[in-house]
Every structure is written in C-alpha cells, then in structure tokens.
C-alpha cells in the first residue's frame, strides 16, 4: 500500500507544530552523466525534496569533468534541493564549477559527517570537504550538514562536522 505523506507524518509527529516542521525527503542515486535519478517522477512528486548523490553501485566513476557534469545536470531536476556528500575522492569533482552551478540552481551542498569518519569508504573526505567549504565561502554558496544516518543512533550527530566547520 502506498501512503500519503501527510497520513504517515501525522501518525508519528504533527507535520507542523511548535518549532518543528517535518519534511519528507529521499536520497536518490545519480545514474549517469545526464544527471538521471533512479526514482521515477511519480515518487518524487510525493516528497518535499530529493538529495541527489553519486554512489559506486549506481554510477560508474568517470573523469572529473564527467562526474561534475552528472552532478550539475542533476540540479536541473526540480525535486533536487541538495547534492549529497560531494566529497568522495572516488568521484572527483571540479568544485569551482560545481559550486557556481549549485548557487545558480539554488541547490545546497551537503557536508556529510560520515565522510569525516576514518572508517568511511569515501576517499579523501576531510581534505575534499575543506576544499569544498573554501569554494563555497568564495561564492557565498549555502551548505547543509548531514549525518548520512543509516542507523537511528547517528541521527543528529554532527560532532566531526561541527569541529571542522569552526
């Protein structure tokens, strides 16, 4: 059975109330250099936003130019509001171009706490995040902190990200 967002959200916590505003989002995989996502429009229509990310199981790593092109083209999808963990050295990106295009498309770039974990499969996370943040500051591009929470105990834990951003 498919559930309506308001129906599900209302059972757990009010969609709005007090200082909490609950949004429904999804992380979608970028599949190719055209920026195609692995979720159909009919699913994207039911959410508030999509976070688009490159993952090795859905995207074959290309050159810096190809990886950047895939990310930038994903910005053309009206549901994409965030680019997830653009810090993985397995998928090198041109941060100058990425940040300029994200700013123009009003897409936030994620600073992912899990990328700072030494056990992460992502390569060069800390160094890449520092470079990304410097470029974002140069262009006054917003970032968003994310935890990449695949386990409930990681939700809201930004210790490494907060330390790095100080």
Which residues make up each language-model segment?
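His/Asp/Glu-enriched short active-site or ligand-binding loop at hydrolase and phosphoryl-transfer sites
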Residues: 108-121
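Short, active-site-adjacent cap segments at secondary-structure transitions
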Residues: 30-31, 116, 152
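Short acidic/histidine-rich active-site segments
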Residues: 141-155
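C-terminal active-site rim and adjoining tail of enzyme catalytic domains
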Residues: 112-114, 133, 146
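A short, structure-level motif marking secondary-structure boundaries and short turns
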Residues: 56, 83-84, 116-118, 145-148
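Short hydrophobic "helix-edge" motifs at membrane interfaces and signal-peptide entry regions
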Residues: 75-76, 137-140
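Histidine/acidic-residue-rich catalytic or RNA/ligand-binding cores of hydrolases
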Residues: 92-101, 119-135, 152-165
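Extended substrate/RNA-proximal surfaces in nucleic-acid metabolism proteins
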Residues: 2-111, 166
């Amino acid at each position: 059975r498919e559930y309506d967002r308001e129906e599900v959200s209302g059972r757990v916590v009010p969609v709005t109330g007090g200082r909490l505003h609950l949004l429904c989002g999804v992380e979608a995989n970028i599949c190719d250099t055209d920026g195609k996502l692995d979720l159909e429009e009919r699913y994207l229509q039911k959410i508030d936003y999509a976070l688009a990310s490159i993952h090795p199981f859905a995207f074959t790593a290309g050159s810096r130019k190809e990886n950047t092109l895939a990310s930038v083209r994903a910005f053309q999808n009206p549901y994409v509001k965030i680019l997830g963990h653009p810090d993985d050295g397995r998928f090198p990106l041109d941060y100058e171009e990425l940040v300029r295009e994200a700013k123009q498309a009003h897409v936030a770039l994620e600073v992912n706490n899990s990328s700072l974990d030494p056990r992460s499969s992502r390569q060069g996370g800390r160094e890449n995040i520092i470079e990304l943040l410097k470029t974002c500051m140069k262009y006054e591009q917003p970032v968003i902190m994310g935890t990449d929470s695949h386990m409930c105990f990681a939700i809201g834990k930004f210790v490494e990200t907060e330390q790095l951003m100080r």
